[in-house]
Amino acid sequence: MKKLTFSFISPERPIVQNQEADFVALPAFEGEMGVLPGHVNSVVILMPGFVRFKNNGEEKEFAIIDGFAEVFKDHIDVFASEASLSEEKQSEEQKQRLERAKKALSSQDADIDIELAEIQLKTQILKMKMKKRKM
C-alpha cells in the first residue's frame, strides 16, 4: 500500500519529520478533512482541533490552535502556530495561562484585547481536552 510522508512543524520545534503515514486527518476550516496517498494537491487552512496520523495501525494525535497544511499526492506538510502531542504532560505554566486567559475575558478593562484573550482561552481548553482524551 502506498504511504504519505508526513511532516509537522511548529515555531518551537519540528514535531514530526518525514514520518510515513497511511492516513492524516486535519481540522480544516470546512470540517475534518481526511488525506490518503494520492490526494489532490491543496493548501488547507487549519482551525483549532486535532491533527491525527495513522501508520500501520498506530495513531498519534496533536492539538493545534491554527495553521495550514500543504497537501501533495505523496506527502503532507503541516505548519501550526502552536501544537502539543497528546502524550505531553500539562505543565503548571499551561494551567496558569488558562487562568490568566479566563481572568482577561472576565475583566472589564478596556485595554484587554478580547479577541486575543479568547484565542488564548481556547488554546488552553483544547490542550486540557487533549489530556482528558488520553486518560
Curated annotation (Swiss-Prot):
Membrane topology, record value: Peripheral membrane protein
Record's keyword terms, sorted: ATP synthesis, Cell membrane, CF(1), Hydrogen ion transport, Ion transport, Membrane, Transport
Gene Ontology molecular function: any one: ATP binding
GO cellular component: plasma membrane; proton-transporting ATP synthase complex
Cell location: Cell membrane
Source taxon at top rank: Bacteria
Pfam families xref list: ATP-synt_DE_N (PF02823)
Disulfide bonds: none
Keyword Ion transport: yes
UniProt cross-references to InterPro entries, sorted A to Z: ATP_synth_F1_dsu/esu, ATP_synth_F1_dsu/esu_N, ATPsynth_dsu/esu_N
Bias (Basic and acidic residues) ranges: 86-102
Residue ranges, annotated region (Disordered): 84-107
Record function comment: Produces ATP from ADP in the presence of a proton gradient across the membrane.
Name assigned to this protein: ATP synthase epsilon chain
Species the sequence originates in: Elusimicrobium minutum (strain Pei191)
